[in-house]
Amino acid sequence: MNMITFMLLLSLTLSIILTTINFWLAQMNPDAEKLSPYECGFDPLGSARLPFSIRFFLVAILFLLFDLEIALLLPLPWAIQLSQPLLTLLWTSILLLLLTLGLVYEWIQGGLEWAE
């Protein structure tokens, strides 16, 4: 058995054992104190479980999408050196066009407006 297979089996076995022990030893008796929000040791001034703005959530999701776009485009200089650089540039252009159209759509729909 080669070393990679051994390490994969060892990590899988260890993960399964630790997860099983965690579920077996965990205390499953939540009370009001455990379910209350923690605010750095101070008594909460109000309800700490207030909903946050949907606009904030939308802007955060858009940030994650465009951050992922940057991560997908980072290996582009090395991908151009492959056997078919035109195909690589075509797929890159399609990805950029799709994300740009999505951004324009969100802008037109008013999804990027912070205040209404």
Swiss-Prot record:
Transcription regulation listed as a keyword: no
Subcellular location, record wording: Mitochondrion membrane
E.C. numbers: 7.1.1.2
Lipid bilayer topology: Multi-pass membrane protein
Thylakoid among keywords: no
Major subcellular site: mitochondrion
Reactions catalysed, as given in the entry: a ubiquinone + NADH + 5 H(+)(in) = a ubiquinol + NAD(+) + 4 H(+)(out)
GO molecular function: NADH dehydrogenase (ubiquinone) activity
Alphabetic keyword roster: Electron transport, Membrane, Mitochondrion, NAD, Respiratory chain, Translocase, Transmembrane, Transmembrane helix, Transport, Ubiquinone
GO cellular component: mitochondrial membrane; NADH dehydrogenase complex
Regions that span the bilayer: 6-26, 56-76, 85-105
Role played: Core subunit of the mitochondrial membrane respiratory chain NADH dehydrogenase (Complex I) that is believed to belong to the minimal assembly required for catalysis. Complex I functions in the transfer of electrons from NADH to the respiratory chain. The immediate electron acceptor for the enzyme is believed to be ubiquinone.
Homology family: Belongs to the complex I subunit 3 family.
Official protein name in the record: NADH-ubiquinone oxidoreductase chain 3
Highest classification ranks of the organism: Eukaryota, Metazoa, Chordata, Craniata, Vertebrata
Gene name for this UniProt entry: MT-ND3
